[in-house]
């Protein structure tokens, strides 16, 4: 099964680390973000939605896998400053 997720890296001057906004393909608004906590660990922030929302197991594992790749990259960027 194809996972139809879009990951957008966002840099924010108010955040110590960049974060990833996660979209379902074809949607304009993200449903969650993957960020790095002050403790330098992955955080998953889910946004409120008016409709019921679900993820397949493939999508869920795809998000987690992307987060595991993103964490060391985000930390490396911060450590190099």
Where are these regions (language model features)?
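Alpha-helical transmembrane segments and their juxtamembrane interfaces
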Residues: 6, 37-39, 76
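A short, structured beta-strand/loop element
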Residues: 17-55
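Negatively charged, low-complexity tracts enriched in Asp/Glu with abundant Ser/Thr
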Residues: 1-23
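Mixed-charge, Lys/Arg-enriched low-complexity segments
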Residues: 41-81
């Amino acid at each position: 099964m194809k996972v139809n997720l879009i990951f957008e890296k966002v840099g924010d001057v108010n955040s110590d680390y960049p974060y990833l906004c996660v979209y379902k393909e074809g949607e304009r608004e993200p449903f969650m973000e993957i960020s790095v906590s002050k403790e330098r660990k992955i955080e998953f922030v889910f946004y409120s939605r008016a409709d019921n929302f679900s993820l397949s197991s493939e999508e869920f594992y795809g998000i987690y896998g992307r987060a595991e790749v993103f964490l060391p990259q985000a930390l490396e960027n911060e450590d190099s400053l």
